[in-house]
Amino acid sequence: MAAGSRIDLTNQFLIAMPGMADDTFAGTVVYLCEHSERGALGLVINKPIDIKLKNLFEKVELSLDRAELAEQPVFFGGPVQTERGFVLHEKQGEGESPYTSTMSVPGGLEMTTSKDVLEAMSSGAGPRRVLVTLGCSGWSAGQLEDEIGRNGWLTVGADPTVIFDTPVPQRYQRAVSLLGFDPRMLSNEAGHA
């Protein structure tokens, strides 16, 4: 890569290598919502916590009558802003009201941090396919690139079916398989030719 050039990893999965030194991210798949010269922001998609969506809605004094969502787990999105909710969802349809605080991610997903998305879901509207996290993952300028350079992460284009349709215990393996090889072939040893 030429000096001064950079790769945009927005709408990519970060897949933790088996030798990941940081226990917080060991075994994780992170969906990158934003990656720029200022840093990166993502959500861990395969670490559920012991809270169901219906319980989270109760905590914010909303009801959730959508059976397909009520028992869905809330996820640990990362160690940053752990008291804040992040809702990863498919892009809103035509004619739907926009939410107060939504980031559009190239590739068709959106991340919303305002309570109005929960209110829409509570009323039976809102996004149909969601992943809700408490906290997010953040990297300062150059930090993620450094971790990738030290063989901490693999990257691959994100596939929404891994986020929304793949059972949680299979998400890591499924994300690795997007690279075209068996996850059992990963080693925690890195080499350079």
Question: For each predicted feature, which ranges?
Answer:
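A short aromatic-anchored loop/beta-hairpin motif
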Residues: 1-133, 137-193
